Amino acid sequence: MSEKDQSVNNTEEDFNVETEDNQNDTNIENSVSNTDNSEANASDSENNSEESIKDEESESQDTKIKELEKLANDNEEKYLRLYAEFENYKRRIQKENQINATYKAQGVLTDILPSIDNIERALQIEGDDESFKSLQKGVQMVHESLLRALKDNGLEEILAEGKEFDPNLHQAVVQDDNPDFKSGEVTQELQKGYKLKDRVLRPSMVKVNQ
């Protein structure tokens, strides 16, 4: 082989080696690029994963906040309802206590009324004997003293004669035909009626003009 041919062969070999080196460099660069891309993709995936976790945590927190707000509102409504019921209960008890205090003497006063009737019938009896008059005067004093004590405890007589008949206060037992009274007026009281403040203990028994 001539020197020229040998030189050509050497040149071709050098070219091939250089080509291979260039190819290797390209492959290395591509490999590095692919590695960089993989790392970038991995980084993006990691970022997306972190954002997804953050979104889930945020949604979970929002849900818990809403649940706590609902629980707080429910508890507030229950408290307000219980408070209102308790206030109504207190007012009812206070009213009942006031009523009981006002009408606590009702039973005793009702039991005493027949005795008052008997005393008043005794006072209507007439007599000329001095001892009788003295006794009657004593009964009169007892009667007046008893009425004062009863009135101090809220007992009131129901006015009847000359008044318009009121079924809430009067009990009509006889019809009358008296020109001195208007129709529907009480012409005579047959038995006194009494009330304790605004509560009727016993209605008046009366005659009513027709």
From Swiss-Prot:
Q: What does this protein do?
A: Participates actively in the response to hyperosmotic and heat shock by preventing the aggregation of stress-denatured proteins, in association with DnaK and GrpE. It is the nucleotide exchange factor for DnaK and may function as a thermosensor. Unfolded proteins bind initially to DnaJ; upon interaction with the DnaJ-bound protein, DnaK hydrolyzes its bound ATP, resulting in the formation of a stable complex. GrpE releases ADP from DnaK; ATP binding to DnaK triggers the release of the substrate protein, thus completing the reaction cycle.
- KW Chaperone (keyword) present: yes
One Gene Ontology cellular component annotation held by this UniProt entry: cytoplasm
Location in or out of the cell? Cytoplasm
Q: What is this protein called?
A: Protein GrpE
Biological process GO terms, please? Answer: protein folding
Q: Provide this UniProt record's keywords sorted from A to Z.
A: Chaperone, Cytoplasm, Stress response
The family this protein is said to belong to: Belongs to the GrpE family.
Task: Supply the PROSITE patterns for this chain.
Answer: GRPE (PS01071)
Q: Where is the composition biased (Low complexity)?
A: 36-46
Region spans: Disordered? 1-71
Which GO MF terms does the UniProt record name?
A: adenyl-nucleotide exchange factor activity; protein homodimerization activity; protein-folding chaperone binding; unfolded protein binding
Residue ranges with Basic and acidic residues bias: 61-71
> How would you summarize the oligomeric state and partners of this protein?
Homodimer.
From start to end residue, where is composition biased (Acidic residues)?
11-23, 47-60
Asked whether the keyword Chaperone is assigned, the reply is: yes
Biased-composition ranges for Polar residues? Answer: 24-35
Protein's organism: Staphylococcus epidermidis (strain ATCC 35984 / DSM 28319 / BCRC 17069 / CCUG 31568 / BM 3577 / RP62A)
Question: Domain of life here?
Answer: Bacteria
User: Which stretch is the leader sequence?
Assistant: none
